[in-house]
Amino acid sequence: MFEDQTFEAIMERMLNSISADIDTREGSVIYNALAPAAAELAKSYIWLDTVLELVFSDTAQGEFLDRRAAEAGIERTAATKAVRAGEFTSGVTIPVGSRFYVDNLYFQYTADGTLICETPGEAGNANLTGRNLLSLDTIPGLETAIVKEILIPGREEEGDDSLRERYFTRVRREAVSANKMHYKEWAEEVDGVGKAKIFPLWNGEGTVKIVVTNANLEPASPILIQKVKDYIDPEPGQGEGQAPIGAVVTVESAVWKEVEISAEVLPEINHSIDEVKSEIEEGVLNFFKKMAFEDNVIRLSQINNIVYNSPSVSDYSNIQINGTSENLVLSDVEIPKLGQVKIIEQTR
């Protein structure tokens, strides 16, 4: 808005207001006296532009976006801690609160028999399955302690884009009166949930089915499914949670659909077929994350585009999805999982 308020423009206006019989050339007393003020005014206009960016929700960032969201009763979701299963010596009672260590991470044993990472965020999602845990407490009879699979993934603090999207959903009243968007909002408020899909009247009048992924956009664990159920409808139809009286909610996990990709590729000079495969795998994985519960068709053209834009690819042909040169349609509850990627090197 104030892009034209430059140092030069401000100086020109100031000098034009000086009497014509006074020397205003660069280096003159008047010029040198006005120049510092003009420079500060130019900086002020730059700050005014910044302030305008920060006070409107579509461009606000950080704490300024937090303050706008708070006006609508929305808070930025804090980082959450990963919850994992553990395996311990049979017959040994592990006291609640016992601490364990592995790979620079500390875990606490909880009342429900799980391990919660003390470090918030995605750190606890690391590939630790099968690793031995070091007990930091003396526990009689404990000989083995092993960290197992992730039950509820940890996630980082909510980013600006996600918070802004939730803010707009609220102020535009897209999620109100227990409509589909409202159920989606409730489900995605639960720590550990990534995305939710809503199926109204799926089993008759008053029934709602919610299908969820975890924060990593993978199938949800039974513990996470129960958390969503307890938050929205702990006592079916009684209105004890977020859902209104009479609504009976069923919560289920999304289901993997394994997707295999094959292609014939000519690598760029000085690039190996392994580099090509790695780039294609990364591109497809990112694409699958974005499309989960947003689109249920994996289009051949989209895979073609990923291969075409891979830096190590010179040329390609015969791309297939699950053995066919056709689009792959997912069911309403399926999310794609990348299976085998078969890349055949073309000869020059």
From Swiss-Prot:
Protein name (Swiss-Prot/TrEMBL): Phage-like element PBSX protein XkdT
Family, similarity comment: Belongs to the Mu gp47/PBSX XkdT family.
Entries under Pfam families matching the protein: Baseplate_J
Organism: Bacillus subtilis (strain 168)
UniProt-listed InterPro entries: Baseplate_J-like, Phage_Baseplate_Assmbl_Protein
